[in-house]
Amino acid sequence: MARIVGVELPDNKRIVFALPRIYGIGKSTAEDICEALGIDPMQKLGELTPEQINTLQDYITAHYKVEGDLRREVAMNIKRLMDIKCYRGIRHQRGLPVRGQRTRHNARTRKGPRKTVGAKKGKR
């Protein structure tokens, strides 16, 4: 298993399918990286030489924000929205959909499981 940017990638997978296991790199970015470095995307990761793996790692760290740095930036962006108390920040704080989706009938993923509200039995 090759370690690139702190992530263990399987040797038996092709490069274009192994690179998206790194947070911040998707399919098209993986293809762009292979094209920029002149590496065959259908080549398996285990077939790369240590020099090629080093150039791959250097290229990724130089041109892309991945893993911890990217996670930290996303978290800081959300925290900034919550600090300035804008609409999107308030939606994040309340755990509701941020991008304008309706919440009357859906949004179960953001709202979590249903909370049962029981009615109190009154006097008759």
From Swiss-Prot:
Residues 95-124 are annotated as: Disordered. The keyword rRNA-binding applies. InterPro entries: Rbsml_uS13_C, Ribosomal_uS13, Ribosomal_uS13-like_H2TH, Ribosomal_uS13_bac-type, Ribosomal_uS13_CS. Pfam families: Ribosomal_S13 (PF00416). GO terms for biological process: translation. SUPFAM superfamilies: S13-like H2TH domain (SSF46946). GO terms for cellular component: cytosol; small ribosomal subunit. One of its GO terms (molecular function) is structural constituent of ribosome. Keywords: Ribonucleoprotein, Ribosomal protein, RNA-binding, rRNA-binding, tRNA-binding. The keyword Cell wall biogenesis/degradation does not apply. Residues 101-124 have a biased composition (Basic residues). It comes from the Bacteria. Belongs to the universal ribosomal protein uS13 family. Located at the top of the head of the 30S subunit, it contacts several helices of the 16S rRNA. In the 70S ribosome it contacts the 23S rRNA (bridge B1a) and protein L5 of the 50S subunit (bridge B1b), connecting the 2 subunits; these bridges are implicated in subunit movement. Contacts the tRNAs in the A and P-sites. Part of the 30S ribosomal subunit. Forms a loose heterodimer with protein S19. Forms two bridges to the 50S subunit in the 70S ribosome. This is Small ribosomal subunit protein uS13. It comes from Coprothermobacter proteolyticus (strain ATCC 35245 / DSM 5265 / OCM 4 / BT).
